[in-house]
Amino acid sequence: MRTLWIMAVLLVGVEGSLLEFGRMIKEETGKNPLFSYISYGCYCGWGGQGQPKDATDRCCFVHDCCYGKLWSCSPKTDIYFYYRKNGAIVCARGTWCEKQICECDKAAAICFRENLGTYKDEYQSYGKSRCTEKSLKC
């Protein structure tokens, strides 16, 4: 019950591209992004350290690196627009930053879909304190 309350509180503060990213994840994987990816492994969710636990966690590591290259943008709050054409995500309209944030999110959502077969429930709600190996560099 406490976990649900914490997630509800987090949702209240979520805006901008995080909502769009969540929708992309749901569309690509069929999974609820809050329950499946928000604290998966060592890199999914806020922050990241250590070694990615599996291919899904590596998607999050690469996503973090992608956001890191956008130092002049606000990836978690800038709102972007996307649509689907023949099933594919198309990042559309907006500023350079908005389009780049969308491309980062698109790549991660596709990566999650491509690695659904390696997704492990044991890495859901994985404590970052358990990620003690030397961190990777982007």
Swiss-Prot record:
Disulfide bonds: 42-131, 44-60, 59-111, 65-138, 66-104, 73-97, 91-102
Catalyses which reaction(s): a 1,2-diacyl-sn-glycero-3-phosphocholine + H2O = a 1-acyl-sn-glycero-3-phosphocholine + a fatty acid + H(+)
Species: Craspedocephalus borneensis (Borneo pit viper)
GO BP terms in the entry: arachidonate secretion; lipid catabolic process; negative regulation of T cell proliferation; phospholipid metabolic process
The UniProt record lists the keyword Calcium: yes
Protein's recorded name: Basic phospholipase A2 Tbo-G6D49
Lineage of source species: Eukaryota, Metazoa, Chordata, Craniata, Vertebrata
Function (record text): Snake venom phospholipase A2 (PLA2) that impairs hemostasis. It weakly inhibits ADP-induced platelet aggregation when tested on platelet rich plasma from human and rabbit blood (15-25% of inhibition at 5-10 ug of enzyme), and dose-dependently inhibits blood coagulation, possibly by inhibiting thrombin activation. Exhibits strong hydrolytic activities toward L-dipalmitoyl phosphatidylcholine. PLA2 catalyzes the calcium-dependent hydrolysis of the 2-acyl groups in 3-sn-phosphoglycerides.
MF terms in GO: calcium ion binding; calcium-dependent phospholipase A2 activity; phospholipid binding; toxin activity
Subcellular location: Secreted
EC numbers on record: 3.1.1.4
Positions annotated as active site in the UniProt record: 63, 105
Keyword set, alphabetical order: Blood coagulation cascade inhibiting toxin, Calcium, Disulfide bond, Hemostasis impairing toxin, Hydrolase, Lipid degradation, Lipid metabolism, Metal-binding, Platelet aggregation inhibiting toxin, Secreted, Signal, Toxin
